[in-house]
Amino acid sequence: MWARNLMARALYDNVPECAEELAFRKGDILTVIEQNTGGLEGWWLCSLHGRQGIVPGNRVKLLIGPIQETPSGQDQPTSGLMHQTFGQQKLYQVPNPHSAPRDTIYQVPPSYQHQGIYQVPTSHGIQEQDVYQVPPSVQRSIGAANGPHLSKKVVTPVRTGQGYVYEYPSRHQKDIYDIPPSHTTQGVYDIPPSSVKVPVFSLPVGEIKPQGVYDIPPTKGLYAIPPSACRDEAGLREKEYDFPPPMRQAGRLDVRPEGVYDIPPTSTKPTGKDLHIKYNCDAPGAAELATRRHQSVLLNHAPSQLGQSPGAQNDAYDVPRGVQFLEPPAETSEKANPEERDGVYDVPLHNPPDAKGSQDVVDGMNRLSFSSTGSTRSNMSTSSTTSKESSVSASPSQDKRLLLDPDTAIERLHRLQQTLEVGVSSLMALVTTDWRCYGYMDRHINEIRTSVDKVELFVRDYLHFARGAVANASCLPELTLHNKMKRELQRVEDSHQILSQTSHDLNECSWSLNILAVNKPQNKCDDLDRFVMVAKTVPDDAKQLTTTINTNAEALFRPGPGSSHVKSGSENIMNSTEYPHAASQMPLLHPGDHKAQGLNKPLPPSLGKDQPPDCSSSDGSERSWMDDYDYVHLQGKEEFERQQKELLEKENIIKQNKLQLEHHQLSQFQLLEQEITKPVENDISKWKPSQSLPTTNSSVGAQDRQLLCFYYDQCETHYISLLNAIDALFSCVSSAQPPRIFVAHSKFVILSAHKLVFIGDTLTRQVAAQDICHKVMNSSNQLCEQLKTIVMATKMAALHYPSTTALQEMVHQVTDLSRNAQLFKRSLLEMATF
């Protein structure tokens, strides 16, 4: 069909993504052998420099049509191309199967090299058959004068010194052109309305306005041809409101609107108040007014009327009357008439915890602390409280879930955690070396008491949210995440028990100065000392639990469609800072209750089976080293080195793929493995101080300065190993290596950064100055969170390979890790020298 000697000029640079694709530069002349070769729409078989391959048809332009096999065909000067006829200047030539003229498909202005604007074709006979979409590179070429040309290849930063920088802004690399687009995609190229010279249809203005500002329909069609042009105006307004017609026409309260809520009508007797409303509201206007008044009364007196039957309340409100955000008082629920509690959506009273739940709490009391700063954590939280107290505090929240979307839940969680950290920091600011002397306590007793009360309140509010998140985790198919969160929650609950008890004891003694003021050191800790010691450990436990919830937010917080009305009806309460735990107070129907068995729609809806599995859970053969990665479980040097060795041996790329790796790759893996296995030194007696450190300030103690300098040298050594691992990973990504290669390289990156986290944890346990301890802890926690993000980004890059977007996101996260590691190393030096 096609002549063999078609010539085409390359319009853009092309970087091949596979071995069959040709690489060429802008301006190269290619020989077109076959168009749409092998049935691949938009791909041409071309030849360049003696090599054949496929090229994207929208990146080249045919020259002059078929050329006779004469030497003059290729020696034509390029300057003559600017003076060709209009039929030869088209960016795209669409072959017409009906032999129609091709000069009306795309009209390009003479200055298309600088503008790139297409005019709307006036012929519509073949617009739905032969449509070429504008590749993203054409749109990006407009700004080529302001920045470098962006290709579809993953861009990796360049190492400069001990950091990485992009040669140009890398965030523009997302969603770049991967595959020549299919012509079935709709609405890719927005055509300015001013470029339409000849209107397709003459429509009245009134029919166009309801469709929006732009006259390009959001559905079918690539050009300004409204598909709804033939509809009448009444048809456009059919979906103006979502209210069903029976809602507007209901003149009596006993007539149920169709399709509002699938609740069978109850057979309870209406109260006298409802009868008064029912028989005095014959007119529609009166019924609507009475309904509004009745609802306002219910909202104002909700706690006292929760025990009444749903029949006493109007069904126009989306939320069933039996389901409220606050629990009914015990006396109201117990004295309620059983006949009035037969509604389908009545919420049963909370059952006492079963034996299994109590046993879980008792087991949690005997747990070991796995915190990254575990050696500084006081063990009073487990030894000072009984299992009975802990089970009483934990059991009422086990059947309450949070019906929130992930974004709202994460935002609220971070707000609660930040409030808790600020409260503890305010309390710690009042704790000095002589803070228990009579003079200091006399001046600051009120401030200390206020801070103590705030810390206890902030911990309680945080626990309300955390218990709801743990309840959500209990509904997941895999219980791995639930068990982990329950252990982390137990630590916070243990601490809260001590805080509550000590705060109560302090209030019992009325914060007497004669009791609290101590003029000489004492060996025994009193209630105030216990409160301060336990409060100091709470932010670490809360940080660990927050990280777990944040990482698995997509699996934990996914309310079903039936919970949207609950959120809208309680939005003001749920978002109020005065009631941060309102969402966690929503009761659930007990699975064994006889009333719950007749429900077609459980409230709230449980997570479906089609929900993706939890990120932190893994099973069987699909478990990889990333699923086992949990860097917060650091105990000591021996366990740390053992864990590093296990992670390194698992899925060892050298042992599995020796025959498939090239020689330089094998040597690179072996070199990285040698650097990773280098241990972190803890023996400071063998360390020789560096002479290059500047003179220190006297504000840092000699022992703390020695520790900072010692671990700074350790950090410097392992930071170089981290940079080498990152270099190898970026080189692997740039050379388009498969997932099994770049995942193995990412393991070296994570293990190298893991050592920096271990250095930070060890230093936190050994320094004496509290401000240095907090700074090192914060930097170490940032590295921890960054490592979690990199693990997830690497998983996504491997699962969605060869997605450029996923690979680019992984590169961004690794680059951010290098910056955070450099800041961590620099902070150690600054604290040691200033």
Swiss-Prot record:
Residues 328-402, 584-624 are annotated as: Disordered. Belongs to the CAS family. Homodimer. Forms heterodimers with BCAR1/p130cas. Forms complexes with PTK2B/RAFTK, adapter protein CRKL and LYN kinase. Part of a complex composed of NEDD9, AURKA and CTTN; within the complex NEDD9 acts as a scaffold protein and is required for complex formation. Part of a ternary complex composed of SMAD3, ITCH/AIP4 and NEDD9/HEF1; within the complex NEDD9/HEF1 interacts (via N-terminus) with ITCH/AIP4; the complex mediates ubiquitination and proteasomal degradation of NEDD9/HEF1. Interacts with ID2. Interacts with CTTN (via N-terminus). Interacts with MICAL. Interacts with TXNL4/DIM1. A motif (Caspase cleavage related site) lies at residues 360-363. This is Enhancer of filamentation 1. GO terms for cellular component: basolateral plasma membrane; cell cortex; ciliary basal body; cytoplasm; cytosol; focal adhesion; Golgi apparatus; immunological synapse. Residues 710-834 are annotated as: Required for interaction with PLK1. The lineage of its organism: Eukaryota, Metazoa, Chordata, Craniata, Vertebrata. The modification Phosphoserine is found at S296, S369, S780.
